[in-house]
């Protein structure tokens, strides 16, 4: 594309220069003067001839200059004075690092554009009364073969090469890699090596009443194993593992030989581990607070522990860092007083404050270039340019329409209605290409508002974003050719559009993508966004004192609304005017910060004054839903997001796991790669292996599926992998290797059976051959199960493996348990899927776990069974096979064939067969009642559809559970244009029969079912906002069933927001009656499901 030459750069007017020369320099209180010359001693890489000591150069460096200029000054001095001047002629400054020492650590002065007076070393030297400070000039080292091999291993684990900078228009990726070294090293240095090696899974939440009742006299029996011997001991639920070991060794003092314990060994040499699992009970936590113990109590299982030697912490050794540290001042600019041009001679100006730039922001749209034109060439195109902050569009302009061709040139300046000084950090220049059949727009560049009618029926084709203020706080300038993202026609990809359109990454497919050429104003000097200095807000007390009663009530009503309730312009004005009153109510924070006009620098400054006075927020109890709201796509300001992350610091590990899925998604809404949230995830992953395990898979899955955020997730994952330790790296390598091999087998098997549902004997034979070949060659001896890191799978049990009768041909795989201390011969069953996106199933299963935790606070155990499920790549994943469970369809068919769907007594008879002892049968019925109630409430609130007898299962102990969550939030399936879902949830006559109820007759079990349903439903209503927020944060992940706020409205309606408790109770009881009245319609659907020949196999979540 031929582009015209750019006009002369913007220059400062002579009268302004003269005026500034007359003004005296000013300095910020307590900071270096912007005009100050700073003495620094530089230790050079060359040595003196006689003494052989390093040469030094004492320079007086301008505080307002940048690091690059300081480096050039050093080079000039070295060229003039060094005895090895030829060395400095031969090598340039870019081949050297600037290092300084702080508290025994070497730090690199990394950012070449950083203003000298903002360097951390200056503040450190001042604190230490050291003048002049010393900076070492050190030659960059060439990476060793070992380093390159390690980076190659990391690239394989990440699934993306973070060293490839071919698709970046700045150095943010490398900049972030370096910035994350410091928090990583701090976390690794501070973690307890022994606890990290054993990663106990604990909680500090009180034991629910229903579990307390299962502990008689606060005592628990545990079985301790050693070799082939075991010993049962009685302990207190409040005992710590250390106390239990001490008691056990006292009891076994004369019987050590029976347990294969030498006389010299004591309790100090052992730890307690769960039999068959990599799950340790260590630390000062009471026994009742270990999650595994609670799980055993809940399921009525015995607690079996093995007396084991602790793992060697050396196995978690972290590879030594080859990079010097960079401090947190890297990339930070000075205050406005330091950067301002006012009071400086123009020869002394090196960096200019953004707040001095009073002109309006503009961009020159040069043109677009597309490799292949669309089929319909009778089109016109135009460019729409928005400046936006989060979801808030600050201003908009667009070009005139022109005929669509391979090359379209405009060469037109678009001037925005926002001044450069008002551009907030995180502001995006959003460029979008629209096309329409007829030129419905004015031929001149216009300034329409978003959504204006003049856009007519224009269709969005391409988009790309550019951060206007980069990761160094510097205003972008000059030429850019940006490769754009195409709007996908695939429904599953359209769901992620709202998140994707926030990315600042460009399309890596440069050869086949649309490119747009733009020009931003050039300047004589870098333009830097200054740091905000906290100052008092004179309006604060006056505004607070003036609030009338009526407006106070109005404000409280706005604050009380749920997150889906849109704020009117009047609401926003009221919230902002009475911002200091709003500050008293933590629930107001998301609404208050949504009311900020981020395109006005004065307003932003006042917002930071508010944030400085957030004592009530800091002291308030953690409300996860509220805090997560501040991390959604509506907030781009790093300070607002930082107070949310700060609040999350108090989350215990188990809760971090609960919300990890959303927290990883929230990283997409950060404007920059390095953020408080990214550091929080990194820190918690490095602190706890269980969190680290899931963080690895959640990030890796996103890297594989989200091209728009590959770089961001990759740089966080690399930072984690560099600090997780050798043992974790080996585990991940094994897991990735297994998945890659199984993926290849699945693809081969699918190619043999095409898209058919049935599975031929030839296909089964081929599978067994391929698995045997795998077992004999490349399959690791053991690997950690991705959805359950406590389990290690061993060799395949090939005779039990099969191809499932489903369109995508998932593999039913069974492995031996690799842990020799496992007590049973049960295999580890895994369904390996290729071709389905499991992220929606993961979300529903995660929400079910959160519902469980909500119900636990009400002392309700609804026996949910959120089985293991994890996405491990692009439409690849694993699902846990629940043991001793079968589908309702199989039970019905095995008895009387397809008509079993109409036989009310079939399920009850099957349960009696499995539990022939009356006591066990009654316990199974009780479990059935509670689990049925739990899934009725959960599936109703989440709008889970397409419920049939092949995706509802039951265990041999009466635990009902649902699988396959392809239709959620009321997006129900239809058959021949008719909605199949005629009931709010599944409560069929055969379910009622198990409860002793039929027709309209009641029973004690049915009454209990109703009571439990109502309690569970009302408990969820108290957490409506949390559920709404969790789904809102997943809106932009690409799930076809979760694409708009209208989808989430379903939850609000299902939970009857706005109704009284009594009305809500009546509403849910009415839903139960609807199910009883129309249960026959469900049975008829189930009958059709069987008759139409939909294959069952041993289908589970397939």
Swiss-Prot record:
Region of interest (G-loop), residue spans: 803-809
SUPFAM superfamilies in UniProt: ARM repeat, C2 domain (Calcium/lipid-binding domain, CaLB), Protein kinase-like (PK-like), Ubiquitin-like
Residues modified as Phosphoserine: 1101
Species per Swiss-Prot/TrEMBL record: Mus musculus (Mouse)
Enzyme Commission designation: 2.7.1.137, 2.7.1.153, 2.7.1.154, 2.7.11.1
Domain of life of the source: Eukaryota
Residues that coordinate or bind ATP: 829-838, 864-872, 961-969
Residues of the PI3K/PI4K catalytic domain: 797-1080
Compartment(s) of residence: Cytoplasm; Cell membrane
Domain PI3K-RBD: 217-309
CDD domains found in the cross-reference section: C2_PI3K_class_I_gamma (cd08399), PI3Ka_I (cd00872), PI3Kc_IB_gamma (cd00894)
Protein name, entry field: Phosphatidylinositol 4,5-bisphosphate 3-kinase catalytic subunit gamma isoform
The UniProt record lists the keyword Cytoplasm: yes
Pathway: Phospholipid metabolism; phosphatidylinositol phosphate biosynthesis
GO cellular component, one term: cytosol
Record comment: activity regulation: Activated by both the alpha and the beta-gamma G proteins following stimulation of G protein-coupled receptors (GPCRs). Activation by GPCRs is assisted by the regulatory subunit PIK3R5 leading to the translocation from the cytosol to the plasma membrane and to kinase activation; the respective activation involving PIK3R6 requires HRAS for membrane recruitment. Wortmannin sensitive in nM range. Inhibited by AS252424.
Keywords: Angiogenesis, ATP-binding, Cell membrane, Chemotaxis, Cytoplasm, Endocytosis, Immunity, Inflammatory response, Kinase, Lipid metabolism, Membrane, Nucleotide-binding, Phosphoprotein, Serine/threonine-protein kinase, Transferase
Taxonomy of the source species: Eukaryota, Metazoa, Chordata, Craniata, Vertebrata
Function: Phosphoinositide-3-kinase (PI3K) that phosphorylates PtdIns(4,5)P2 (Phosphatidylinositol 4,5-bisphosphate) to generate phosphatidylinositol 3,4,5-trisphosphate (PIP3). PIP3 plays a key role by recruiting PH domain-containing proteins to the membrane, including AKT1 and PDPK1, activating signaling cascades involved in cell growth, survival, proliferation, motility and morphology. Links G-protein coupled receptor activation to PIP3 production. Involved in immune, inflammatory and allergic responses. Modulates leukocyte chemotaxis to inflammatory sites and in response to chemoattractant agents.
PI3K-ABD domain ranges (all copies): 34-141
